[in-house]
Amino acid sequence: MLLVNRAITLNLVKRCCWRSTMFMTPKRFLGTSEEESTAALLLQKNLIQRNNMLYGHGSGTIRCTVFDAGGNIVSPALDIKREELVAKHGLLPRDLRKIEKSRKNDLVPSFLVRKNGILVSLATIKTLIKPDMVIVFDSFGSLNSTSHKAFLNSLKLRLQNLDMVELKKDPLPYEFRALESIFISALSNLTSEMNVQVTICKGILQDLEYSITRDKLKFLLGQNKKLSNFYKKTVLIRDMLDDLLEQSDVLCSMYLSDLKNGVEHKDDDHSEIEMLLETYHNHLDEIVQITENIISNVKTTEEIINIILDSNRNQLMLLGIRFSIGMLSLGGPIFIGSLYGMNLENFIEETDYGFIAASAIGMISLGALYFYSIKHLHKLQKMSLFNYTNYARDVKK
């Protein structure tokens, strides 16, 4: 993106300099290259600053909020260098890829357990959990959001772990309390989003029961796409928890406080973190089931609408066929009337009942053609699957 911006700025500077050279003296024209390079550098710096303000990251820094072991905010909105973060906390450079590129909500979650830390990327929440520190990475657009402020307040209360009248002390270690706060915030956001999506979809489906319009179908299509994206996001988070619950060594390595104090856990000694993950896995599974039911209702409604539209289309086709049958039936009496009305001598005109006979023959031919065609049309309408298989068998013979 910087290369594109640099090319645009150079083109703008060249145009400005080309226009200005039309009124320059020869001495002044000699200094245009220096002015052009200076203007290009200034514009490039301004564009870099503008991009940093828009996307919330610098060339080598990451903005974050740091909590200490007591749950207090040490430094809000602190810019930490990427190299310093990797070297100080024992991370790999690729571990920060999702955090650096998280300009929007990430669909794919990640849960990385390292030697002395846990790196979590869950929807809009991206944190690094250590046995005595929590680093919350502030993504673009989340600094002033209500959900981000609520998450920071909830995380602060759980990390402080004060013994109050309404809230007792939590026996879980520091890192598990941080994880629980992350899951609670993520689940509350997912639940709120699910309630909004479900309410909108139910309202559209109820409106479609009374009238089917183009605007409602278009709105239902857009809402179905949003619901599908939300369903994918919840399924990915649930699958991530499934993978974690199946890896006993990873669960044991999540006891950061015990590992710091020299206490190692065996493969089957991870009941606390397993119960914690299973609890939120069940909540996520409930959200997934509700979303699946709504998606199935939307698909069922779409199928019913398609059936209704096909039925209406068939009715229009039948109406056109009936008009065609009527026009075909009118051909019989018209033909007889044209013969009777020819300016030729015939015995019909000499009789007293010629006109009545011609009219009767025309009406009889009209009725015969009409009822014969309608009878065959009804046979085609009442054709069942059994009749179709017998017809296909007869054709093969």
From Swiss-Prot:
It is found in: Mitochondrion inner membrane. The keyword Membrane applies. Its main location: mitochondrion. One of its GO terms (molecular function) is magnesium ion transmembrane transporter activity. A motif (YGMN) lies at residues 340-343. GO terms for cellular component: mitochondrial inner membrane. It is a multi-pass membrane protein. Gene3D superfamilies: 2.40.128.330, Magnesium transport protein CorA, transmembrane region. It comes from the Eukaryota. Pfam families: MRS2-like. Keywords: Ion transport, Magnesium, Membrane, Mitochondrion, Mitochondrion inner membrane, Transit peptide, Transmembrane, Transmembrane helix, Transport. GO terms for biological process: mitochondrial magnesium ion transmembrane transport. The chain crosses the membrane at residues 316-336, 354-374. Residues 1-37 form a transit peptide. Forms homooligomers. Interacts with MRS2. Mitochondrial inner membrane magnesium transporter required for mitochondrial magnesium homeostasis. Modulates the conductance of the MRS2 channel. Involved in the splicing of mRNA group II introns in mitochondria by affecting mitochondrial magnesium concentrations, which are critical for group II intron splicing. PANTHER family: MAGNESIUM TRANSPORTER MRS2 HOMOLOG, MITOCHONDRIAL, RNA SPLICING PROTEIN MRS2, MITOCHONDRIAL. Belongs to the CorA metal ion transporter (MIT) (TC 1.A.35) family. This is Mitochondrial inner membrane magnesium transporter LPE10. The lineage of its organism: Eukaryota, Fungi, Dikarya, Ascomycota, Saccharomycotina.
